[in-house]
Amino acid sequence: MRSELKHQAPEGFITLIREGMGKREISLNQLAERAGVSPAFLSRILNRQRGLPSDKTIVRLGEVLDIEPVELLLIEAGRIPEAFKTTLSRPQIPALLRATGKLSETDMQKLIKMAQAFALRHAKGKAK
């Protein structure tokens, strides 16, 4: 029985999908069609009768449901988004994440803008 539970979709993932369907007023059949999966497949996931789909399908579900950021759905699925893997492997990142937990929303927005400016400057430097 334990192995069955291990392969079920996590509750947070299911909740995000169901909430997204409610907000977008989209049926299971419509979501399945737009995400490129069968309604039966999606129903089994949402009813905890099947494990998670591929990362590509998870991202597609998030896009169809306008879940922002779409990476949130991957995280709720227990997966690390590919774009985050390289960043998280840098030794400075854990210290940065710990420090940001204490910032106000305003300071967090300033930090994001600074990081984006640094990234843009770095990208331009590599383009030369």
Positions of the model-derived regions?
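Short alpha-helical "recognition helix" segments of helix-turn-helix
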Residues: 27-32, 61
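DNA major-groove recognition helix of helix-turn-helix/homeodomain DNA-binding modules
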Residues: 56-72
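Conserved hydrophobic/aromatic packing and binding residues within compact polymer-binding modules
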Residues: 17, 31-32, 42-45, 72-73
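Recognition helix of helix-turn-helix/homeodomain-like DNA-binding domains
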Residues: 36-53, 60, 75-79
